[in-house]
């Protein structure tokens, strides 16, 4: 991809921000991202950023993708979240066997997939593939997708667990159960996916063991450095970056509000002249800068190694996860500082500060943001101890 193509996508997203900001309450009320918003984002080329060029994609730098995600989330947290998870799935689809990629993209390069990775369903091995049954929750953006990626423990006929796999299913093989009703990220439409005995051919499943080793069937045709990145490094930042964006949106809204605010409780003091408020703003800005600088450092270093054909080793993968969970924490601390400094009017329904605050905290509880798990794994690595599989590297 040329640098100008990625820059054009980011510029297109920047132009969309006023519209996405204006639709933020509508998105929350609908409990789903409006189709018009997804279409507008699609027209910028955003969903093609991580898609292989052989299927009309741009194969952009991960940092370009994450920069666009941060912008979208700074206008509407729910829209940024959905855009990020749908967008990163194009990268994961490129790891599947070539036959699966052809099946998904050959007819329509604009296809999108949602996901739910927790292995809450059952996959039974049958001739030529697996039979999938169960219910999967938290499939963000599923109403704006026509495929889904579902996690399950693949078992032999007698039920013996053999592998944790991701299964790829078309919309005709599942039902969406509209159950999403939450206090945060309300507009993500993260509904349940219900599957009843769908047959999934072997070429539409991907072993997490292969993903962890960065040796996937899709590498046969997608040889570019982008697809050599560790799944845990890119996917984890696709969850943290929207939260950084939400906190950035809260920061922008807060500064604009404080610039004009007069604090009646302090005898008409201008909020902008309050030294205590100034300190909170400085601290919030510092947290956001630290979080984003780590994104830039890690994505740049990962891509440099991938381009050089070098193996991305466990110590770096541990550091990326360490920085990623800390980045989430830094964004949460920033949005908390801003919310606390906003006064009672920020509690009113419809104000952007409270929406960003709720959305950021909702994103924080995603499994990939468990700080103790990631930080403990980093500490174990520093002492040369075995790193547990749940470190999600």
Task: Name what the model sees in each region.
Residues 21, 25-28, 289-326, 336-347:
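C-terminal helix-coil-helix/basic helical segment that borders enzyme active sites and/or dimer interfaces
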Residues 135-174, 178-179:
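DPxDG-like acidic metal-binding loop motif
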Residues 245, 282, 286-289, 321, ...:
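Generic structural signal for well-ordered, non-transmembrane alpha-helical segments
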């Amino acid at each position: 991809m040329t640098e100008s193509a990625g820059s054009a996508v980011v510029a297109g997203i920047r132009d969309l921000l006023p519209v996405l900001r204006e639709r933020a309450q509508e998105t929350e009320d609908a409990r789903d991202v409006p189709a018009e918003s997804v279409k507008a984002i699609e027209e910028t080329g955003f969903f093609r950023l991580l898609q292989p060029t052989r299927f009309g994609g741009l194969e952009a730098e991960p940092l370009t993708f994450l920069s666009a995600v941060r912008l979208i989330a700074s206008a509407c947290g729910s829209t940024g979240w959905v855009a990020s998870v749908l967008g990163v799935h194009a990268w994961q689809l490129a790891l599947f066997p070539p036959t699966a990629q052809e099946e998904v993209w050959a007819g329509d390069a604009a296809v999108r997939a949602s996901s739910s990775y927790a292995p809450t369903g059952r996959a039974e091995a049958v001739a030529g593939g697996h039979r999938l049954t169960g219910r999967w929750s938290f499939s963000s953006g599923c109403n704006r997708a026509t495929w889904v990626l579902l996690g399950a423990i693949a078992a032999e006929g007698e039920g013996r667990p053999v592998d944790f796999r991701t299964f790829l299913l078309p919309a005709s093989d599942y039902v969406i159960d509209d159950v999403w009703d939450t206090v945060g990220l309300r507009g993500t439409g993260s509904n349940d996916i219900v599957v009843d005995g769908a047959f999934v051919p072997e070429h539409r499943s991907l072993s997490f063991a292969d993903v962890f080793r960065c040796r996937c069937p899709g590498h046969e045709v997608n040889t570019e450095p982008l697809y050599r990145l560790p799944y845990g490094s890119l996917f984890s930042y696709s969850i943290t970056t929207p939260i950084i964006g939400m906190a950035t949106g809260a920061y922008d809204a807060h500064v604009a509000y404080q610039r004009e605010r007069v604090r009646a409780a302090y005898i008409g003091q201008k909020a902008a002249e309050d030294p205590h408020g100034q300190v909170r703003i400085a601290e919030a800005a510092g947290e956001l800068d630290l979080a984003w600088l780590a994104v830039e450092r890690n994505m740049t270093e990962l891509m440099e190694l991938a381009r050089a054909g070098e193996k991305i080793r466990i110590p770096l993968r541990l550091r990326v996860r360490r920085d990623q969970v800390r980045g989430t924490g830094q964004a949460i601390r920033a949005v908390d500082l801003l919310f606390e400094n906003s006064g009672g009017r920020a509690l009113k329904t419809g104000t952007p500060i409270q929406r960003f605050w709720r959305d950021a905290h909702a994103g924080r509880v995603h499994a990939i943001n468990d700080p103790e798990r990631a930080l403990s794994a980093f500490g174990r690595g520093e002492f040369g101890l075995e790193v547990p599989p749940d470190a999600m590297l």
